[in-house]
Amino acid sequence: VGSEMCIRDRYIDYLALHKLNYFHWHLTDDQAWRVEMKCRPELTEKGSIREGEIFGLYPGKYQPLPYGGYYTHEDVHEIVRYAAERHITVIPEMDIPGHCMAVLATYPQFSTTPNEPKKAALTWGIFNKFNNVLAPKPEVFDFLKDVFSELCDLFPGQYIHVGGDECAKRWWQ
């Protein structure tokens, strides 16, 4: 984490150097959920880890070692503070309703195909054939309320980005 924080600090310093005042932080995707959720600890425990890593361009070289990690609340507070000292607002992104394989690996019942096993993706891209979208179900909306409430407590800015891209509507039909 130490070297990662150093890289992060440098990145924020570069934003400040170039007079950029927003840091859009992409914290979730098909591959992992990268921020601690105390309201949903199983999401952090399971959704932040994938079964391996692929190096290089697709198809790349597969390394079957668990890969993952996440930012704790303390990490987030430190990043937000560091950025604010440089007049930068951090905008977190929680990619929904698509790009949710890491969420669905933790909560398969949130899927439109809940009986099919899900796991966090190893590669990048659009996974329409795997149905990586959240279903419009009451328990999904409860989940979103929990997660957005916690994100609002963590990030003092006025925006949270929800992604919304590459979501195959056919899964909702």
Residue ranges and their predicted role:
Residues R10-D30:
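Catalytic domains of carbohydrate-active enzymes, especially glycoside hydrolases
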Residues R8-Y11, V76-H77:
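Short alpha-helical segments and helix-capping/turn motifs at coil-helix boundaries
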Residues Q31-E85, C100-E139, R170-Q173:
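Aromatic- and acidic-residue-enriched carbohydrate-binding clefts of CAZyme catalytic domains
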Residues G2-I7:
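Short, small-residue-biased leader/transition segments that mark boundaries at the very start
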Residues H18-F23, V76-P97, N132-H161:
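An active-site-proximal structural segment forming one wall of the substrate-binding cleft
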Residues V1, T28-A32, D95-H99, D165-C167:
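Active-site beta-loop-alpha junctions enriched in small/polar residues
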Residues Y11-D13, D29, Y62, A120, ...:
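Residue-level detector of functional hotspots within protein domains
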